Amino acid sequence: MQMHQIRYFLALCGERSFTRAAGRSGVSQPSLTNAISALEEELGGALFHRRPLVTLTTLGHAVHPYLEQIAVNAERAREAAQALTHGRGAQSDIATSTHSAGPL
């Protein structure tokens, strides 16, 4: 499973159209369709009813919250990494002493 497949899945859930989801994702409709088909193959079944409207199947409904959480966590990880690499990360306090410890 790849992140772009998850993003396309979520876009298709929102748009309910392969053409609109592809446009929203910045890819061609055949690329989005191929990615969704590969995801369906990996998960073992159809995620969407394609006719008359694009709607989630039972399997699609079952995996939706998990794929959505993966996307949310990936975004949080990206934000945390950017914060650290741009100097906005967690701070560490370091204490030193000018006195030496006596003999043990």
What are these regions (language model features)?
Residues 19, 48-49, 101:
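Nucleotide phosphate-binding site architecture
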Residues 29-30, 79, 85-104:
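N-terminal winged-helix
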Residues 59-66, 104:
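Short amphipathic alpha-helical coupling segments at ligand-binding clamshell hinges
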Residues 1-31, 35, 63-68:
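N-terminal short secondary-structure element
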Residues 19, 53-56, 84-90:
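Glycine-rich ATP/GTP-binding catalytic cores of kinases/NTPases
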Residues 42-43, 63-85:
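Alpha-helical linker/hinge and terminal dimerization helices associated
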Residues 40-58:
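A short LG(V/I)-centered, amphipathic sequence patch enriched
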Residues 15, 24, 37-46, 78:
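Residue cluster at the C-terminal edge of the helix-turn-helix DNA-binding motif
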